[in-house]
Design a protein with these regions (language model features):
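Non-catalytic alpha-helical scaffolds and adjoining flexible linkers that form interface surfaces
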Residues: 1-24, 28-205
């Protein structure tokens, strides 16, 4: 059977040295998580090295054979989010997001993880977007896909959330509880809905 070449966008999740000059690269693509062997990538003049950097959107060509391990045929960087590296907290959270998404890809099959991680990188790269906003957005999106999402439609008793009422939040059941002296009102709920339906770049404006 002939090997198949496939061009795709990819984000590097992990790089592991293999042998004297190779690396095994874990990539997140729009179609999911894949592993590829980058042969000779650690050699000084390797043409692959520039296309497998962390915090970047890369365009790669993968050769698919009989095994699950692909071979990286070519790689070039499309977009580099280098501003992230200028701030320790943003860098730390970017690595945390990579680790979280990589783990979830093993548990849940979804094409959305690629766009989620790419959005996180673009948001962290823009210092006009507050770091806390990006963190909240990411955590809400991850909770949505891991079955731990917040109920933003009805309260604990199944009644639709009302604009003229206040609520407290049940962290165990991830649901709002009606309370006349509650800490959460319609504005808080509206903001959470906006977070789930939009992106940090838009919310921050």
């Amino acid at each position: 059977m002939n090997n198949t070449r496939k061009k795709t966008l990819a984000i590097v999740l992990r790089r592991t040295d293999f042998g004297e000059a190779d690396r095994i690269i874990n990539l997140l693509t729009p179609g999911g998580k894949v592993s590829a062997m980058a042969r000779g990538v650690r050699k000084p003049k390797s043409k692959l090295a520039g296309g497998i950097e962390f915090f970047a959107l890369n365009e790669v060509v993968l050769i698919e054979g009989k095994s699950e391990m692909r071979t990286l045929s070519s790689a070039r960087m499309r977009e580099f989010f280098g501003e992230i590296l200028k701030d320790f907290e943003r860098t730390e959270f970017a690595y945390q997001a990579i680790k979280t998404v990589s783990w979830l890809c093993e548990q849940i099959e979804s094409d959305d993880f690629f766009e989620i991680l790419l959005t996180v990188f673009r948001s962290l790269n823009n210092f006009e977007i507050d770091l806390s906003l990006t963190k909240k957005w990411f955590n809400l999106k991850i909770a949505e896909f891991s079955g731990d999402e917040i109920n933003l439609e009805s309260d604990k008793n199944g009644k639709p959330l009302q604009a003229d009422l206040t609520y407290n939040f049940d962290f165990y059941d991830k649901v709002f509880v009606e309370d006349s002296e509650g800490d959460f009102n319609a504005n808080h709920i509206k903001f959470l809905r906006l977070m789930l339906s939009s992106q940090p770049q838009i919310i921050s404006k």
